[in-house]
Amino acid sequence: MTTDPAQAPTRARSQHQRRKRIVQAAAALASRGGVEAMQMRTVAERAGVALGTLYRYFPSKMDLVVAVVSEEMDLLEGSMERRPPGSSTPASRAVELLMRATRGLMREPELADALIRSLLLSDVKTNFGSRMTGMLLRVASEGEATDGQRTLVGALNSVWVMEMIEILRGHATPEETHERLDVAAQRLLADF
């Protein structure tokens, strides 16, 4: 059985659209009831795919959570490219990006909580930290970043993750988080 090479782009587009529907269905369920609401059978039904198809794309629920996080990161990167942080200092540009991410996540607090909890408790390797660090480096550094700068920006990213946890637990407001991120960024990125 041979396949027509002319059909390959159509098949790839169809697979991409199917994957996108699955991720969107999972995100919608998580935003209403956390990761617990992301039952694989329910995700498959909402996405209009067979359960076996869902498992072919995402062998576990955690793989699906990682895909949802990746989609959120794509949205943040797109936002940053369309509207780069305009602040005058590296520290304030980094904080502007982190607060943009915070506002984006807090539009769907159930989803944010589900994603952060799952990532913290998961054994699945993700590139979330390195992607966020990369975005922070792009807005904060001028030119090629040094290893020391990568370490400092990674530390700022870790502060932000903890601040997100505090917001989600109801122990901090976005305003308090903004203040603390300002202080941390000013100190960590002082030599950028």
Predicted regions and their residues:
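Basic, helix-initiating cap at the start of DNA-binding domains
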Residues: 1-33, 37-46, 63-66
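Short linear capping/connector segments at secondary-structure termini
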Residues: 82, 114-122
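Short, hydrophobic secondary-structure boundary micro-motifs
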Residues: 39, 112-116, 176
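Hydrophobic alpha-helical connector segments
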Residues: 67, 78-107
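Amphipathic alpha-helical packing segments from all-alpha helical-bundle domains
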Residues: 77, 96, 119-165, 175-189
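Short hydrophobic/aromatic patch on the recognition helix
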Residues: 48-58
